[in-house]
Amino acid sequence: MADAVVIPGGWFGPNAPLLMYAGDVAERRGATVHRHSWSQEFPKPDQAEIESWVAGEIAPLIDTISGRPLLIGKSLGTNAAAIAAERSLPAVWLTPLLTLPWVADALARATAPFLLVGGTADEVWDGNIARRLSPHVLEVEGADHGMYVPGPLTDSIAVLSHVVVAVEDFLDAVAWPSS
């Protein structure tokens, strides 16, 4: 049985649309999805201690799961990239904090495949870094940190569908879950 761990950002829980649908992709492939909610207020997200704080929240959950779960994290949750690297876990990172050196360094250490999803109007996204780190990248022109794009709201909803397709394509490409 496959498992996926959904790791939220700082402002919305694990059922925010990007995370909800990414987790649903894993669930439709037969995975048990574990949606984590932060148990306490987090430290400043731009300080290096945030990485160990996130690890302290997420590692105990991962330890209860047998096998190698897929990690699905957004924003603050991408500080779990160090855990993914240490344990060789595949991952989907939505709006990763690529401008934080410890997040980019953890991604560079990863041996398991991962998908990076971000937008060109997001201040913490760097498309060049993303493409250097992974062959699996969805970059949305004009999307901000919430993956909203200028124009009618339906344009931003369409971005959500592109993210779902990218997650499906990534999981197909890496044959997840493996039999």
Q: Which residues does each predicted region cover?
A:
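Serine-hydrolase catalytic machinery in alpha/beta-hydrolase-like enzymes
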Residues: 1-67
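Acidic beta-to-alpha connecting loop that harbors the catalytic carboxylate
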Residues: 10, 120-123, 143-144, 151-152
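Short, conserved loop/helix-junction motifs that constitute active-site signature segments
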Residues: 85-86, 105-111, 131-133
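Catalytic histidine-centered segment of alpha/beta-hydrolase-like enzymes
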Residues: 45, 143-160
